[in-house]
Amino acid sequence: MKEMYNSRKPKEELIKLKNKENTMEFIIAEEGLPINIGYQGASIAYYGSEIELSYETVPPHGDEIFSASLPLLGIKLPFWMYGRNLIFLDDYYLLAETVKTGSWNPITSMLINIHTGEYASLGDWYNSILVKDEGIELVNTFDRKSMVLKDINDLDWI
């Protein structure tokens, strides 16, 4: 069954395809539009690549946590990520809120190249993201830490 799907973000428009044997969502992401996924997990396609999120746990404060893999590359990422505020940038990158495998805290924002499997920590948790002409403005609305990401080549990629 194919239907238009609006998630918790009002401007987000995704295509949701349901398979009767598997409740995992298939989502075609759009650049800059946050995606929030539920406990069923999701396979997200973006510019010729794909990331698959599989449910792992839900912490006491809510918001599901997922393990992630890049099935076209045969790579399982070595951290878990929250299924909220997943933002795809440029043609290659996913910005996600991540945690160490088996935990839910501390949260760190991570930039992931879904075409190569490389990733770079942004060093802190940024829950407010704004794309501007001069770069990506990232803010932690709880402790007011902020940064502007201008050049991804300045990050330490793993």
Indicate where each model-derived feature is located:
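Surface-exposed loop/turn elements that mediate protein-protein interactions on large endomembrane-trafficking
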Residues: K2-N36, E56-W80, S103-D124, F142-I158
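Repeated scaffold domains used in trafficking and secretory/extracellular systems
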Residues: T23, A29-G48, P78-Y92, E97, ...
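Amphipathic, interaction-prone secondary-structure segments
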Residues: S43-A68, D91-Y92
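Recurrent small/Gly-Pro-centered beta-turn motifs in extracellular repeat architectures
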Residues: Y55, E97-T98
